[in-house]
Every structure is written in C-alpha cells, then in structure tokens.
Amino acid sequence: MDEPIIDLQSDHYFMGEALRQAAKAYEAEEVPVGAVVVREGRIIARASNQVELLKDATAHAEMLALTQAQAAVGDWRLTDCTLYVTKEPCPMCAGAAVHARVARVVFGVGDPKAGAAGGALNLLQFPTLNLRCAITAGVREDECRGMLRRFFAEQRQKTKAAGPESNGGPRTGLPPADEFRPLTGGDELDA
C-alpha cells in the first residue's frame, strides 16, 4: 500500500486545503466555505460552496465533498474518513456526516447561530443517535473567520452601493408584513 502523502495528524495542512476550496467559493461570490474529505492520509474529495452556481440550497461544500468521497470509495459509509470544513457544519451537513458515518469532523470557525457541531446544537454527538462523529474545532480559526468576515463585508458594501431596490426585496419572497392578513374559514391556500 502507498504511504500517506501527509501524516494523519496534520489538521493544519488539511484545513489549508479546505481554505483553498473556500477561496474558490469566495472568487465565485459564493459564501466562502470549503471542505475536503481525508482517508488514510490522502484527500479523496474536495469541494466549495456552489449554492448560487447550482441554484441548489443543498450544494454546501460539505454535502458536495461527502458525495464525491462516497463515489471515490464506492460506498456510502465513510467510517474511516475525516471531513475538514472551514465553517462549523449546519444541521443539514452535520446530519449528512452522521448518516455517512464519518469518523471525525474538523472545522475552522464556529457558528453559534446555526452550527450543528456544538454551536447552536450538536447533531454530531447527539445523545440519542447510535452514531456519533468525533469533533475537532478551531483549526486555523482566524483564517477561516477572516475570509467569511471579508466576504460578508464586501456583500454588504455591494448591496449598500446598489441601493435598497438591488436586493430584490425580502429574501423570503413574502410580501411586507403590513400586507399580511389572517386566514378566515373561506380562504383557500394556493396549491
């Protein structure tokens, strides 16, 4: 068997590879999150966020990397793999990591509002699940945080410069709150 390219304990190195993927997302004006999946000291999958490009809310870096890794190993089980991601996984991505039986998740910057690896909740080690992932947090945290902060500062500047009409209204697509009225017994919902 080939010797691993890099020592398995090199979280710093593999997070650097995830940061390279995040930089690709940044350049594409996607939220700059990158992920790599490592097995036996080798990167078997790499991905960056592609939500805007693919017009797919599930096209997070972690989801894309897990799918690639499963194809690379020829199995949906990733029991001997580590997922490296620049930002704490959301509930969807954490759930996918648990279902794929990823052994360990390593992330850069935490997300106290929506993170599911200990930030807002911890799906990776949820007590009632029979599968859990080991967690390593804070690897190259400052670099991961810095890229996200720069990205969102630039996005706010672009929106501000373009004026209030540029953002297409509320992101929910719902009418303004003053246009809502309660449903009555005779109202029907659009199908």
Region spans (language model):
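A cytosolic small-molecule/anion-sensing beta-strand core signal
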Residues: R39-E40, T67
